[in-house]
């Protein structure tokens, strides 16, 4: 018998080695976004209104290639609202399936960026954002459209110090 024939015996272990570049190219790919839960002393949630969407969002945005989610969050906060804030604990991980306009799934992270004493420090990135505001949690969730579940989940996670996973949110 040849070595090839031995490899075909029932129960024989075959080599399944695949070149790393081929293996990794075949793995799932997803977009990564990171947002921040920022509240005022009254517990109202900061939202921004992008000029390219119908609904409001938590401040944040897409991660650059090979950028950690918390670094993306800090960068986006500085770019979008002009604030260099400490990005604190992870509150929410949300997964959304691919859609017609977005052909990959999205994994979104929400981090705690603390309590902001006053909105006077906020400087909007005017080429992307039309408005901002602090809203009661229920009002904030209503303005988020399809990702509304992130607001109560983030507030609950902040209170309990336990991150929340949201599938399809």
Predicted regions and their residues:
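Short Gly/Pro-enriched turn/cap motifs at secondary-structure boundaries
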Residues: 25-28, 101, 124
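Conserved Nudix-box catalytic region and its N-terminal flanking loop in Nudix hydrolases
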Residues: 40-79
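Short, well-ordered beta-strand micro-motif
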Residues: 38, 110-114, 133-136
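Acidic, metal-coordinating catalytic segment for phosphate/diphosphate chemistry
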Residues: 2-35
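Nudix hydrolase/Nudix homology domain
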Residues: 54-55, 127-169
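A short coil-to-beta-strand element that immediately follows conserved catalytic motifs
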Residues: 84-93
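Active-site-adjacent beta-strand/loop module that shapes the phosphate/pyrophosphate-binding cleft
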Residues: 96-121, 154-155
